[in-house]
């Protein structure tokens, strides 16, 4: 068994039958789009629920209600009313209560996605709130983003570098981003995606199945280490 898989097992509470996946990243990077695409692909195979975080609105929850295949009652918006860091890390009580309510409502739930409010590169989830974490950045922010570091870049279980199709328009060199991500991640996986066209979405799903759900499947070839 790899150290990565062992770590995932240790982080997961084996007394429950669901996994909590935290999804964080800067505003506009593609967090909500990732969850929307994922739920469309896996909702027929797994029982899924989603918790979203916005400071003053429930815009992300409303988007997912309109665009994902999940029933509205499986999507819950949390209005944090303040710094998005606090609601997922220092005081995650609102989100923990939302998760408890959701899994009580749907005892068959296998995956709970928890989307943070849009934040910078320092967002991290409380280990009580998320079993595994995905951090989303995008190419439009510039090729320098991976080497800027921060906990989201260096500590997340999976780094998603989204909007690869925009690289020619913003002067970003994907090979430079790959080199820097390898250096900053130190062996932890990352993946390039174009979520608008679902490019490498299957790789994210494969990572979830292998390292979050602990299925006996091959590591996706699109993952980079």
UniProtKB/Swiss-Prot annotation:
It holds the Pfam family cobW. Its main location: cytoplasm. InterPro entries: CobW/HypB/UreG_nucleotide-bd (IPR003495), P-loop_NTPase (IPR027417), UreG (IPR004400). GO terms for molecular function: GTP binding; GTPase activity; nickel cation binding. GTP binds at residues 25-32. Keywords: Chaperone, Cytoplasm, GTP-binding, Nickel insertion, Nucleotide-binding. It is found in: Cytoplasm. The keyword GTP-binding applies. GO terms for biological process: urea catabolic process. Homodimer. UreD, UreF and UreG form a complex that acts as a GTP-hydrolysis-dependent molecular chaperone, activating the urease apoprotein by helping to assemble the nickel containing metallocenter of UreC. The UreE protein probably delivers the nickel. Facilitates the functional incorporation of the urease nickel metallocenter. This process requires GTP hydrolysis, probably effectuated by UreG. HAMAP family: UreG. PANTHER family: UREASE ACCESSORY PROTEIN G. This is Urease accessory protein UreG.
């Amino acid at each position: 068994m790899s150290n990565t898989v062992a770590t995932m097992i240790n982080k997961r509470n084996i007394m429950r039958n669901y996994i909590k996946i935290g999804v964080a990243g800067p505003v506009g990077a593609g967090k909500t789009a990732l969850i929307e695409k994922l739920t469309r692909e896996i909702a027929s195979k797994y029982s899924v629920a989603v918790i979203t975080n916005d400071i003053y609105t429930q815009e992300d929850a409303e988007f997912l209600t309109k665009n994902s295949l999940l029933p509205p009652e499986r999507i819950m918006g949390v209005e944090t009313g303040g710094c998005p860091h606090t609601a997922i890390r220092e005081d995650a009580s609102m989100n923990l209560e939302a998760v408890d309510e959701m899994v009580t409502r749907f005892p068959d739930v296998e995956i709970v996605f928890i989307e943070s409010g849009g934040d910078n590169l320092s967002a991290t989830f409380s280990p009580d709130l998320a079993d595994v974490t995905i951090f989303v950045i995008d190419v439009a922010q510039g090729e320098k983003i991976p080497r800027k570091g921060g906990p989201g870049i260096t500590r997340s279980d999976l780094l998603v570098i989204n909007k690869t199709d925009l690289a020619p328009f913003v002067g970003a060199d994907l090979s430079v981003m790959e080199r820097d991500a390898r250096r900053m991640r130190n062996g932890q996986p990352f993946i390039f995606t174009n979520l608008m066209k679902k490019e490498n979405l299957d790789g994210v799903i494969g990572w979830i199945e292998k390292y979050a759900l602990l299925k006996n499947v091959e590591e996706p070839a699109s993952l980079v280490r």
